[in-house]
Amino acid sequence: MTREITIGSVKIGGDRPLVLIAGPCVIENEAATLRCAERLMTICNGVSVSLVFKASYDKANRTSVTSFRGPGMQEGLRILQKVKDSLGIPVISDIHSIEQVKPAAEVLDIIQVPAFLCRQTDLVVEVGRTNRVVNVKKGQFMAPWDMENVVGKILSTGNERIILTERGVTFGYNNLVSDMRSLPIMRRIGFPVVFDATHSVQLPGGQGGSSGGQREFVEYLSRAAVATGIDGIFMEVHEDPEKALCDGPNSVKLDDLPALLKKLKAIDAIVK
């Protein structure tokens, strides 16, 4: 069993029910972000699933230099603070440099370390020092047991509020696969484990100037992951994925989320 972590009104880990971390890939604008957060809260309240709202203020690793990156840190954090204040739900976003850590910690309930940066010791340690909950995405290039070393870096700061997220493993060019063994392996480290169901179906750089995705497989991988007994599910969602400014091909349409959550909640209840 993993340790239980409290994030505002949300508890994850231990024998707690499945938690949803969800939101748009990137903050497109304030109105759309608030609209998405409100819709997610309504959906989650309807199926009794705890929610952490996710949105990035800067997508620093987009495929092309011309790709939309977001509003930037200052404006993005302001919008996320407004989500917290107006809806009372915890928020998570990702940082990309040491300089971003302190201002991000003033707003975010969970600071996320991107998969590509999970081995950057100075960055990981700096995030740990905030004593905020830290969500580390396992690099697409890493074995699940190697995440114990990443956890050790955070623990060295005295911070024990750690979440690990699986988001697929590189499989040749422009492709990812999900090894479900990684979920119980990482849970043995002792901290809550989340499955990123939408980035796991991403086709990195698969459209030349942007990444592709296979949204049709999100439900299948989600069901399989929840059946292993994970603590949370991570999904990027959008009201109209075809018009999303980032990661539309692998994002879940908000209209499709309630039915999927009901299935995942039922599976979670069986395995816990």
UniProtKB/Swiss-Prot annotation:
Gene3D superfamilies: Aldolase class I. InterPro entries: Aldolase_TIM, DAHP1/KDSA, KDO8P_synthase. GO terms for molecular function: 3-deoxy-8-phosphooctulonate synthase activity. The keyword Cytoplasm applies. The keyword Cytoplasm applies. Its EC number is 2.5.1.55. Pathway: Carbohydrate biosynthesis; 3-deoxy-D-manno-octulosonate biosynthesis; 3-deoxy-D-manno-octulosonate from D-ribulose 5-phosphate: step 2/3; Bacterial outer membrane biogenesis; lipopolysaccharide biosynthesis. One of its GO terms (biological process) is keto-3-deoxy-D-manno-octulosonic acid biosynthetic process. It holds the Pfam family DAHP_synth_1. It comes from the Bacteria. Keywords: Cytoplasm, Lipopolysaccharide biosynthesis, Transferase. It is found in: Cytoplasm. Disulfide bonds: none annotated. One of its GO terms (cellular component) is cytosol. SUPFAM superfamilies: Aldolase. It catalyses: D-arabinose 5-phosphate + phosphoenolpyruvate + H2O = 3-deoxy-alpha-D-manno-2-octulosonate-8-phosphate + phosphate. HAMAP family: KDO8P_synth. Belongs to the KdsA family. NCBIfam families: KDO8P_synth (TIGR01362), PRK05198.1 (NF003543). This is 2-dehydro-3-deoxyphosphooctonate aldolase. The gene is kdsA.
